[in-house]
From Swiss-Prot:
GO biological process, alphabetically ordered: DNA repair; DNA replication
Single Gene Ontology MF annotation: DNA binding
Cofactor requirement: Mg(2+); Mn(2+)
BRCT domain sequence ranges: 574-652
Organism expressing this protein natively: Sulfurimonas denitrificans (strain ATCC 33889 / DSM 1251) (Thiomicrospira denitrificans (strain ATCC 33889 / DSM 1251))
InterPro entries, A to Z: BRCT_dom, BRCT_dom_sf, DisA/LigA_HHH, DNA_ligase, DNAligase_adenylation, DNAligase_N, Hlx-hairpin-Hlx_DNA-bd_motif, NA-bd_OB-fold
Chain sites annotated for binding NAD(+): 30-34, 79-80, 108, 131, 165, 280, 304
Record-given protein name: DNA ligase
HAMAP family to which the protein is assigned, alphabetical: DNA_ligase_A
Residues involved in Zn(2+) binding: 398, 401, 414, 419
Active site: 110
Amino acid sequence: MKKEQYIKAVELLNLYSYHYYVLDDAITTDEVYDKLYHEVLEYEESHKEDILKNSPTQRVGDTVSEGFSKAPHLSRMWSLEDVFDSDGLQKWLIKTYKLDSNISFYCEPKYDGASLNLIYENGELSQAITRGDGEVGELITQNVKTIRSVPLSIEHKEKIEIRGEVVIFKDEFEKINQTRLKDGEALFANPRNAAAGSLRQLDSSITASRNLVFLPYGVGENFLEHKLLSQKMEYIYSLGFKKPPFCATCKDFNEIEAVYQEMSRNRDSYPMMLDGMVVKVDEIAAQIDMGYTVKNPRFSVAYKFPAVEKITTIKEIILQVGRTGAVTPVAIVEPTNIDGVVVERATLHNFDEIQRKDIRINDHVIILRSGDVIPKIIKVLTHERDGSEVEYKRPTICPVCESELLDEGVLLKCQNLTCEARVINSIIYFASKPCLNIDGLGVKIVEALFNSGLVKSVVDLFDLTLEKLLTLEGFKEKKAQNLLDALGSAKGCEYWRFVNSLGIEHIGEVASKTLSAKFGSGFIDATKDEIVACDGVGEEMAESLLEFIRVNRETILKLQNILKPLEPLQRQEAKENPFKGKSVVLTGSMSESRDMIKEMLESLGAKVVSSVSKKTDFVIYGEDAGSKYDKAMDLGVECLNEDEMRSKIEQA
């Protein structure tokens, strides 16, 4: 093969690939493609200096990365405002028409996958970046080059950002999970997770094997001169990108609603997962004039599909025991596919819920799955009962340790402090990030430690040695030493972390900080009156704390002696400033970690809380501020961005 023949062969292979992967219209056989592919490969092996960047051989993932570097987007990747029904759409249209009444709309599917930004320079794919925080994402160019529907080169020489969603088709998702099942690997929960996980593989050959598909939905930085978004997108598709299964231009609410209803009805027939329809103002000039809010473009909205409901059957009701001993019922149902996710469990909340809804084993029920929330039973189909249904009897003994349960009405509790489920969940909580943040103490390792007899309580963790850990399956010297080092690093922790790690019912992070600041190690001898006098600590919290200390005093003292948590320094009275004595909520991504900003505000005398209410004085918001920002605006709470917050501090 000569160089001219090689160039033509690459062009032909790319044409074959385009018809097969983008148009779904094969124009040759696998045999012809494979033969030509190997001829190109042979030429490239002996002429490395001639290898073209858009050669299909350059797609094959065979390199292992040590990690991904960060890269900025040329222009921000925005999130969209959501509406969930026709009333929500009407309200959005009214707002939009106030900005410009002479507009039309472009409607397209809202794909349920992983967002991706492609940057082309001089017609070549130069960077592929995950969405990240909208400003900066992870650079995954090598992995993305393995996606057949991403052109390595395009007939457009100016720099351009092409945004889209990476998805896995439903049938491909089933094949991947079947393979993982055979190989004894954990199954992916849904196609979205599979797509996101596949994109971020350090070994790009794994990405290549997953048959990912890239579907463009817009552009970022560009120098295109089209007057309409619909025209701009047709141009993008003409560059070799896959078209959506459905798109339309609409004049008004009625046309948009008709397109939405059709798309919603047919959603199961599309090869990829969809979770709604995106509506955008079609006129580019109007988009520019409308601009953006803090969070979203004003010219676009995501019209979400309704939550999905399915009928299934309750096979059994099992009990789960948490770290505090609370026993929770869970319904095991016939495996049911809801929008690409196989549901096998549904929450029952508590035993009163079972009685209220008269839920029985073998009942036919309607379950609802909304977003990533655990499915719940919304209706029992009593008219379908045939006599095989079995009433569920309220349990009296713990399903794990068989000790007698304490019946508190709505709540049932196991009081056995050595109950396996309580111990395991207590250790997991003890090691979690808001507590002692001990790396390497995940569920499986904690279970292995407990089942081996090495750890029967939190205190036992600190009796572990290298020799003991090496007796466990899967533990080699490095892994064992890393765990011992992590346990050692927990010593000398902040006192509030120690209090929080005890897992006292009703005593969370905020209360732990309050109690630690007030009493330090003296919290163990504090009286009820002293505890209730603390800001934000009520009667129920005080009683829970005192009962925990009564039962676990010896364990608390042992842990305190082992960990030697640092006594809180007596914080000097903060000088007068706008945040002193104020209730503050943080939301969104900021220039520094949320913990650092929280610590700074607390040093100024602010009380940083997790939820917005009428009592909230300030909401500090960053990029992609969520529902907390919206609630604050509704309640009239003063909202400050990070720069405004710092300006207030400097002016004080």
